Amino acid sequence: MMYHIPGVLSPQDVARFREQLEQAEWVDGRVTTGAQGAQVKNNQQVDTRSTLYAALQNEVLNAVNQHALFFAAALPRTLSTPLFNRYQNNETYGFHVDGAVRSHPQNGWMRTDLSATLFLSDPESYDGGELVVNDTFGQHRVKLPAGDLVLYPSSSLHCVTPVTRGVRVASFMWIQSMIRDDKKRAMLFELDNNIQSLKSHYGESEEILSLLNLYHNLLREWSEI
């Protein structure tokens, strides 16, 4: 399943990020890509050795970790270090698949269950640059407001179409979920959303408490910690 997570960054945070990224050191995006991806990748990324990068990636991690909808949809166990990319002048990233595992500075290795893109450019400021994701439900084209994030299974083939006008800037990362199976994770997310909706309409009740108990028992049964 694909999920739109709105308002991960406020407009003020986005503006500050963009101002700082104007001063960043950008390098060839292929430095973080395997052999298959390097053949179809043509973009730029912030140099991960820079002091600015260290500060910005920490801010992204803090923002997603504090976002309740992101947590409910991803049920994250491990987050990769966020990266930042930029597309302009017809730069693009052809169809590719993300690696199943990635190195992690604290955990050694992590499994990539979910991929996330946090948009940092207003969609009206550039042409092209859609994230295109192919999954079992068809093809999805994504171009979200700045500050919003999209989550999708890392097993999906995906690409970024050429940016023919303006500049597209984003942060991206991978998530190892506590729930490996996409279908089980989607069921838990739906159950959680329905519980929250019922609570907002009817307040606390024994029936809602019973559903909450069911949610946590399923999470306990399926989670890998």
From Swiss-Prot:
Q: How is the cofactor bound?
A: Binds 1 Fe(2+) ion per subunit.
The UniProt GO MF terms for this protein read: 2-oxoglutarate-dependent dioxygenase activity; iron ion binding; L-ascorbic acid binding
The record's listing under HAMAP family reads:
Hydroxyl_YbiX
Instruction: List residues binding 2-oxoglutarate.
Output: R168
Q: Which UniProt keywords apply?
A: Dioxygenase, Iron, Metal-binding, Oxidoreductase, Vitamin C
Q: What is this protein called?
A: PKHD-type hydroxylase YbiX
Q: Locate the Fe2OG dioxygenase domain: which residues?
A: 78-177
EC supergroup of this enzyme: oxidoreductase
Domain of life, per UniProt, equals Bacteria
The cofactors it requires, by name, are: Fe(2+); L-ascorbate
Instruction: Report the EC code(s) recorded for this entry.
Output: 1.14.11.-
Q: Which GO terms describe its biological process?
A: DNA damage response; intracellular iron ion homeostasis
Entry-linked Pfam families: 2OG-FeII_Oxy_3 (PF13640), PKHD_C (PF18331)
Amino acids binding Fe cation = H96, D98, H158
